[in-house]
Amino acid sequence: MSRGRLLSVLGAVAVVAVVVIGLSQTKSDNSAPKPDTFDLAAAKRSLAGAPAPLAALHDRSNTLIPADKQVYAGEIKGLAGHPIVVNKWASWCGPCRGEFPVLQSTSVKYGKRVAFVGLDASDSDSDASKFLGHFPVTYPSLVDRNSHIAQSLGIGRSFPTTMYYDARGKVQYIHQGPYTSDAKFAADIERYALGRPS
């Protein structure tokens, strides 16, 4: 192949690469959070009558709470006697964005029996607040700005990550990656948080 022809082929490949990259970036821009149809007020009403520690979480629904390792430990200790699901997320995490509708619906389904706590890691307050404006949840999120809590739990690198504590406060399972169906999330809650064999 002549040098001129080779340069022409390489130029064509470069143009195709630029077009593909441009289209993929446009697609990712379209995946930004969109207003959700989840009705937080109705969800909270459906959780009325939950045990006091769980009701206290619902009272702080959709809030960001500054935290450190001691605050996290206190939150878990205060939920003693109840199974706990902790979901680590960030506003910039595409898989987290895809998972939140599953978290919304399933946390309402189990919210009278299981404590749900968010862990917003490596994020900014303003971006996290905007994210929760699009994807409100019936539980608070502890803010782990520098991922110190996540690192101490051994879940510092993967987003999203979901931890399951049994009612004694013992970690039973850590799921890395997003839940894409209510059924899979519910099955893991039943098995690892509630201790019911599948």
Question: Where on the chain are the PLM-derived regions?
Answer:
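A short beta-strand-turn-helix
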Residues: D59-I84
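Extracytoplasmic/secreted envelope proteins and their assembly/folding machinery
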Residues: K69-I76, F100-S107, D125-L132, A150, ...
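Thiol/disulfide oxidoreductase modules built on the thioredoxin-like
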Residues: K130-T138, R145-P197
